[in-house]
Amino acid sequence: MKMTGIPFGLSDWSTVERTEHKGTTGMAYWRTRQFGDLRVRMVEYTPGYQADHWCSKGHILLCLEGELCVELQDGRTFTMTPGVSYQVADNAEAHRS
């Protein structure tokens, strides 16, 4: 990833509009900022949330609070706790949380 054309700036996430996204179970609440081609989101999941699809887009994800269970399409599962991150490239292992 190469980031260009993004001047220095601060993001006050408490002022970014929150949108709701329903999963197979539970809800995800996204706060999204777009910087050129780069999308940055702060996401809150309700307990028991599970995405309604497998994702093949690349992500860098950092768990700030609670636990997040991540499932790969090949059956592997991972539990993230505060301070743990994952990173995956576009079109690599399909995943869902």
Model feature map: region roles:
Residues 1-41:
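A short, N-terminal "cap"/entry segment at the start of jelly-roll beta-barrel domains
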Residues 14-16, 46-48, 82-87:
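A short, sequence-level motif marking secondary-structure junctions
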Residues 36-56, 89-91:
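Conserved short histidine dyad/triad with adjacent acidic residue
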Residues 45, 54-70:
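Short, conserved beta-strand element in jelly-roll/cupin
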Residues 74-91:
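Short acidic-glycine-tyrosine-enriched beta hairpin
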Residues 96-97:
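Short, Lys/Arg-rich amphipathic alpha-helical interaction segments
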